[in-house]
Amino acid sequence: MVDTPYRKMLAAKIHRATVTGADVNYEGSLTVPPELLVAAKIHPYESLHVWNVTRGTRLETYAIEGLPNSNDVCANGAAAHLIRPGDHVILAAYAMVPEADAATHKPRLIFVDDNNQLSHVGPEIAGPNLRSDSDDTHLVRSTEMTPDGQPLAEGC
């Protein structure tokens, strides 16, 4: 039997969700609207990396499904010490991808507005004022805005 090498790759990302609540007394996790979990193809109880854009903190927890149409993104348990209401966060889930598939692997990337409504599904912004072109092999200049309407930063 031959061991298949795997790479840990980004599987899904919810970009710039707005935190609506934090409850240090809850047992743990991050509450996410079910509509966003489905759009991102993230399962309840799946491991989540949470990157707090506002505070610069990072943590790992798991997703739990919030109430339908609630738009609530809530930090629960110990995470509530690092994430506060009003913070913008990026939620990321990873998967082990066979080495043979790594070069063509495409994660599911969703972008939300300040009300945690799905804005669009699309390509990763490659860097300030850059984006991947249609075949993802070249970088081209972009005048795009961030999902919340802010201009992309100049330079790196």
Swiss-Prot record:
<keyword id="KW-0704">Schiff base</keyword>
<feature type="active site" description="Schiff-base intermediate with substrate; via pyruvic acid">
    <location>
        <position position="29"/>
    </location>
</feature>
<comment type="pathway">
    <text>Cofactor biosynthesis; (R)-pantothenate biosynthesis; beta-alanine from L-aspartate: step 1/1.</text>
</comment>
<dbReference type="Pfam" id="PF02261">
    <property type="entry name" value="Asp_decarbox"/>
</dbReference>
<dbReference type="GO" id="GO:0005829">
    <property type="term" value="C:cytosol"/>
</dbReference>
<dbReference type="GO" id="GO:0004068">
    <property type="term" value="F:aspartate 1-decarboxylase activity"/>
</dbReference>
<comment type="subunit">
    <text>Heterooctamer of four alpha and four beta subunits.</text>
</comment>
<keyword id="KW-0210">Decarboxylase</keyword>
<dbReference type="GO" id="GO:0015940">
    <property type="term" value="P:pantothenate biosynthetic process"/>
</dbReference>
<keyword id="KW-0963">Cytoplasm</keyword>
<feature type="binding site">
    <location>
        <begin position="77"/>
        <end position="79"/>
    </location>
    <ligand>
        <name>substrate</name>
    </ligand>
</feature>
<dbReference type="GO" id="GO:0006523">
    <property type="term" value="P:alanine biosynthetic process"/>
</dbReference>
<keyword id="KW-0068">Autocatalytic cleavage</keyword>
<keyword id="KW-0456">Lyase</keyword>
<keyword id="KW-0566">Pantothenate biosynthesis</keyword>
<dbReference type="InterPro" id="IPR003190">
    <property type="entry name" value="Asp_decarbox"/>
</dbReference>
<feature type="modified residue" description="Pyruvic acid (Ser)">
    <location>
        <position position="29"/>
    </location>
</feature>
<feature type="active site" description="Proton donor">
    <location>
        <position position="62"/>
    </location>
</feature>
<dbReference type="InterPro" id="IPR009010">
    <property type="entry name" value="Asp_de-COase-like_dom_sf"/>
</dbReference>
<keyword id="KW-0865">Zymogen</keyword>
<comment type="function">
    <text>Catalyzes the pyruvoyl-dependent decarboxylation of aspartate to produce beta-alanine.</text>
</comment>
<feature type="binding site">
    <location>
        <position position="61"/>
    </location>
    <ligand>
        <name>substrate</name>
    </ligand>
</feature>
<comment type="similarity">
    <text>Belongs to the PanD family.</text>
</comment>
<protein>
    <recommendedName>
        <fullName>Aspartate 1-decarboxylase</fullName>
        <ecNumber>4.1.1.11</ecNumber>
    </recommendedName>
</protein>
<keyword id="KW-0670">Pyruvate</keyword>
